[in-house]
């Protein structure tokens, strides 16, 4: 799963920013999903995975909005949200550990399931790597992320909205962090 986190960070770094809150985003998204699984055991695992990615997307969008609209440097924003997200984890969990006994068997077995000799999580990573590669090399968004990283001023003259592209990079980073959670 580290490769998925690295891809999210790559999108942000290529846009001349940094996201220090990825681990906290992962932890908060994971905590929300774990508590959801414990409280609502009838929710299927794929829905929980979508919930995790969506939670991460919202947290990444929060970072992106602060960087884009308020113009706060990314290192300051993500250092602050790192602490905020960690605090939210503590508040949501009530300061307690979440026990694996509270989870459904299908949720716990997700990491142990294998297809063609590879763990299911490895297949997820392979699919994300392929999708990320295609996005970065074959779409206008991918080229825009590269362009603003090379020269933001020239990117503006080329018609690229630098702030919006950075916002999307933070959303991608957040979504991938949440998915890993």
Map each language-model feature to its residues:
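Transmembrane helix-bundle core of multi-pass membrane transporters
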Residues: 75-139, 165-167
């Amino acid at each position: 799963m580290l490769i998925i986190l690295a891809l999210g960070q790559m999108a942000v770094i290529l846009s001349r920013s940094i996201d220090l809150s990825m681990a906290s985003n992962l932890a908060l998204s994971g905590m929300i999903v774990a508590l959801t699984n414990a409280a609502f055991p009838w929710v299927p695992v794929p829905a929980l995975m979508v919930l995790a990615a969506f939670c991460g997307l919202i947290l990444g969008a929060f970072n992106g909005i602060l960087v884009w609209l308020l113009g706060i440097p990314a290192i300051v924003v993500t250092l602050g949200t790192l602490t905020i997200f960690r605090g939210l984890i503590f508040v949501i969990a009530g300061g307690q550990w979440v026990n694996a006994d509270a989870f459904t068997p299908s949720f716990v077995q997700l990491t142990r399931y294998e297809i063609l000799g590879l763990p299911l999580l490895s297949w997820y990573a392979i699919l994300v790597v392929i999708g990320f590669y295609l996005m970065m090399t074959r779409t206008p968004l991918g080229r825009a992320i590269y362009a603003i990283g090379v020269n933001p001023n020239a990117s503006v003259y080329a018609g690229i909205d630098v702030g919006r592209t950075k916002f999307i990079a933070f959303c991608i980073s957040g979504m991938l962090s949440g998915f890993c959670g």
